[in-house]
């Protein structure tokens, strides 16, 4: 009996040992790396990555702190919606109905086309208005047409204008040049020009003027050639107050003397073809001051006059050059 029990116990031990050996072989086969198995050993460059590295435990508890995406998510703004107020039909009608006391304003034009010329037409239909310049040349005008307030340059040459009235240029504070060449102007009112603060150039050749009006102090260029101007028609000291006068052209008139005194700003004086026979010793120079010089006055024309310039040698000592004229 004991022998049979020993044999049965031995067989059980052998079965368990065989079973354990088979299980060990299976486990070794499963754990042994096969050829081409990329999961057993990964070669990346000079580094070998093993599956065992993936056994590292990663703590995900602090991911919320490490990656805070709150700034990238736009904040939703909630605003209150206001419902449109209901308007009654009577209020709508009241808004659309005009008051019977209201009158529609008619636009006024104070610009170029609002001024009427002597032909009964707007000035800028008879003349040509370009910017602030008005061109009325050869337009059969008999007087100065009403001009736009912004007029800076006026050209009304070769017309039939005979008189300049006191209000012809009223309010034209920006008027810088007036050219009335080739008209029939015989008189200019004393108030027509003197109140023009910006006037610099006054061009009046080929007219019938016997006298000069009062001139504004800002005049720089004065051309009154080919008129009927007489010495008696020029007021005493008419030019001395013109501190900016540089060019004075009085040729081809009826002057019998040189008008003076002349402003120190003068650069050019044309008096040819008049009736001048004599001059004062201080016409150009201050005889009381022998160091006096007038370097700017380089152009004096007295040719075409009966005066003998050699009779007045003391009259030229301050000039940079002698006048042009008769010396014998």
From Swiss-Prot:
Subcellular location, principal: secreted
InterPro entries in alphabetical order: Leu-rich_rpt (IPR001611), Leu-rich_rpt_typical-subtyp (IPR003591), LRR_dom_sf (IPR032675), Mimecan/Epiphycan/Opticin (IPR043547)
Sorted UniProt keywords: Disulfide bond, Extracellular matrix, Glycoprotein, Leucine-rich repeat, Repeat, Secreted, Signal, Sulfation
Residues the record marks as carrying a glycan: 46, 80, 101, 308
Post-translational modification: O-glycosylated. Sulfated on tyrosine residues.
Segments annotated as LRR repeats: 150-171, 174-195, 198-219, 244-265, 266-286, 296-316
Any one of the GO BP annotations: angiogenesis
Disruption phenotype: Increased organization of cartilage collagen fibers featuring more smaller diameter fibers that are closely packed. Dysregulation of small leucine-rich repeat proteoglycan superfamily members in cartilage, including an increase in Lum and Epyc, and a decrease in Fmod and Prelp. In a surgical osteoarthritis model, a reduction in cartilage degradation and inflammatory markers, decreased loss of cartilage integrity, and reduced synovial membrane thickness. Decrease in vitreous body vaso-obliteration upon hypoxia, and an increase in preretinal neovascularization upon restoration of normoxia.
Domain of life, per lineage: Eukaryota
Pfam families, per database record: LRR_8 (PF13855)
Signal peptide: 1-19
A GO CC term attached to the entry: extracellular matrix
Cystine pairings recorded for this chain: 285-318
Organs and tissues of expression: Expressed in cartilage (at protein level). Expressed in the vitreous collagen, inner limiting membrane, lens capsule, trabecular meshwork, anterior surface of the iris, the area adjacent to the nonpigmented ciliary epithelium, and weakly expressed in the retina of the eye (at protein level). Expressed in the nonpigmented ciliary epithelium of the eye.
Domain LRRNT intervals: 112-149
Compartments in which it is found: Secreted, Extracellular space, Extracellular matrix
Site (Cleavage) location in chain: 20-21, 30-31, 111-112
Sulfotyrosine modified-residue sites: 69
Role: Inhibits angiogenesis in the vitreous humor of the eye, and therefore represses neovascularization. Binds collagen fibrils. May be involved in collagen fiber organization via regulation of other members of the small leucine-rich repeat proteoglycan superfamily.
Subunit structure: Homodimer.
Cited PANTHER family: EPIPHYCAN-RELATED, OPTICIN
Sequence similarity: Belongs to the small leucine-rich proteoglycan (SLRP) family. SLRP class III subfamily.
Protein name: Opticin
Organism listed in the record: Mus musculus
Organism phylogeny: Eukaryota, Metazoa, Chordata, Craniata, Vertebrata
């Amino acid at each position: 009996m004991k022998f049979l029990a020993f044999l049965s116990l031995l067989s059980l031990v052998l079965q368990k040992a065989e079973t354990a050996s088979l299980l060990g072989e299976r486990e070794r086969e499963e754990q042994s790396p096969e050829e081409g198995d990329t999961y057993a050993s990964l070669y990346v460059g000079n580094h070998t990555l093993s599956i065992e590295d993936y056994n590292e435990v990663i703590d995900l508890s602090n991911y919320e702190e490490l990656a805070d995406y709150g700034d990238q998510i736009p904040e939703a703004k909630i605003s209150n919606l206001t419902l449109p107020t209901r308007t009654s039909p009577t209020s709508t009608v009241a808004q659309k109905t005009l008051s019977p006391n209201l009158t529609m304003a008619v636009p006024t034009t104070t610009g170029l086309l609002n001024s009427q010329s002597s032909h009964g037409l707007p000035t800028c239909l008879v003349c040509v208005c370009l910017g602030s310049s008005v061109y009325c040349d050869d337009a059969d005008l008999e007087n100065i047409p009403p001009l736009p307030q912004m007029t800076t340059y006026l050209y009304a040459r070769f017309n039939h204008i005979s008189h300049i009235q006191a209000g012809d240029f009223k309010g034209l504070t920006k008027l810088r040049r007036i050219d009335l060449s080739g008209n029939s102007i015989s008189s200019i009112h004393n108030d027509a020009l003197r109140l023009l603060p910006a006037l610099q150039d006054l061009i009046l050749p080929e007219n019938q003027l016997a006298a000069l009006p009062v001139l504004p102090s800002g005049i720089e260029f004065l051309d009154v050639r080919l008129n009927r101007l007489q010495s008696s028609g020029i007021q005493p000291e008419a030019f001395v107050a013109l501190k900016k006068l540089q060019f004075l052209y009085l040729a081809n008139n009826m002057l019998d003397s040189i008008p003076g005194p002349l402003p120190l700003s003068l650069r050019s004086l044309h008096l040819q073809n008049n009736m001048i026979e004599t001059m004062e010793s201080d016409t150009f120079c201050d005889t009381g001051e022998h160091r006096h010089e007038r370097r700017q006055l380089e152009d004096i024309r007295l040719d075409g006059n009966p005066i003998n310039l050699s009779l007045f040698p003391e009259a030229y000592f301050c000039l940079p050059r002698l006048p042009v004229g008769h010396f014998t």
